[in-house]
Regions:
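Conserved NTP-donor binding/palm subdomain of two-metal-ion nucleotidyltransferases/polymerases, i.e.
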Residues: 1-129, 135-370
Length: 370
């Protein structure tokens, strides 16, 4: 299998519930030895979906057809993630109790919200990176103080203005398993005019299994999924998509109509492309989402080229990244500093802070190491 073929094979594995007959194709491929299972594991591991793959294969009695070592590995990963998510649920409870004592009710986001809201068939299905939650702006710094009083601390020192950041610097606790991000804003300021705390609060849902906290409506979860995947993480720009995001979208589409959600999203051409790409990747029919557009063809082409050529992936990604940093970052900030005293102060403050240089270097290092 080529990289592209392996990617789409993996997508159909995730949506076996919609086409269980694909299980027979998996059995045939197992017998033919056409799949490089090492590459399959590397792909799934990179997208953080090994526990999900294990659950799908187990549900359709496919594990016994895999190489024994692979089947054992998948089972072990699933069990580890199951127990990890049990601990995360306990951490979510502890966070909620701590904040509730002072009148703060967190609104959990992303994977934590989906886990609490029963989106997954099994708590071991989804790997959670961080615990993200949103609070009212008046409770932002208070929430951080309350958690820090309980033993949480910053993962690393922060050199900026915490009060104006989208979220508080990442926090960890030696007795808990997950990193925590306290959000003042749900998304970057670029998207605040059409997706903000007020909108989310208006449709938030209480969590049945944990009183004192909330999650976004399914409609807003989909909007946030798109913004996170294709705008904030620039998936559309680079031609990259996460299987975790696609799978969450797939499950949410069973609760709400994607065509209606599009009406609430300003970047309509890109969201149509994203939904259409999800349909293609997961091997679904038009009941998932019936539309396609030019942007879909662009996204698909960039994604295909990324798989076909490592050189294209590296060169294309690096060219965009460097251009954005030079013209969208350095040049823009310099020009703005000519008329903005606040920007001049910000630049001087950063240039005088040794920590800023280290953070800057690490930022570039993380990007080019991927």
């Amino acid at each position: 299998m080529t990289n592209k073929e392996l990617f789409y094979f993996t997508g159909k594995c995730l949506s076996l519930d919609d086409h269980p007959e694909f299980g027979q194709e998996i059995v045939r491929l197992c017998k033919s030895e056409l799949i490089d299972w090492q590459r399959f594991v590397e792909l799934c591991n990179g997208h953080l979906i090994l526990p999900l793959v294990c659950l799908k294969f187990r549900s359709y009695d496919l594990l016994r057809h895999l190489p024994e070592e692979l089947a054992t590995h998948l089972k072990d990963i699933f069990e580890l993630n199951y127990h990890r998510n049990e601990q995360i649920l306990q951490q979510l409870d502890a966070i909620t109790r701590t904040l509730n004592k002072h009148g703060v009710e967190p609104l959990f986001l992303k994977g934590a919200a989906n886990l609490l809201d029963g989106l997954y068939s099994n708590i071991g299905e989804r790997i959670l990176s961080d615990i993200d939650f949103l609070v009212q702006e008046k409770d932002y710094l208070l929430s951080a103080e309350l958690l820090e009083n309980e033993g949480y601390a910053m993962v690393e020192p922060f050199s900026g203005d915490i009060a104006t950041e989208k979220h508080y610097p990442r926090l960890y606790h030696p007795d808990y398993i997950s990193i925590v991000e306290i959000h003042r804003l749900p998304v970057k300021k670029d998207y605040q005019h059409w997706f903000n705390t007020g909108l989310i609060e208006a449709e938030k849902k209480p969590v049945g299994s944990l009183s004192g906290c909330y999650v976004p409506s399914d409609n807003h979860k989909i909007v946030h999924n798109f913004i996170h995947s294709q705008l904030a993480n620039e998936g559309y720009l680079y031609g990259t998509v996460s299987f975790r995001d696609l799978y969450d979208l797939y499950l949410l589409s069973k609760r709400t109509d994607l065509s209606r959600t599009v009406e609430h999203i300003k970047s309509k051409q890109k969201v149509v492309a994203y939904f259409a790409f999800a349909r293609l990747t997961l091997g679904l029919d038009d009941t998932f989402y019936p539309h396609r557009n030019f942007n879909f063809r662009v996204l698909t082409k960039k994604h295909s080229l990324n798989h076909q050529s490592r050189f294209f992936y590296t060169a294309f990604r690096s060219a965009i990244f460097i251009s954005k940093r030079i013209f969208g970052g350095y040049v823009f900030q310099f020009l703005k500093s000519l008329y903005s005293k606040e920007m001049r102060r910000s630049i001087v403050r950063r240039l005088r802070n040794p920590r800023w240089y280290k953070d800057h270097f690490n930022f570039y290092k993380r990007f080019f190491s991927n």
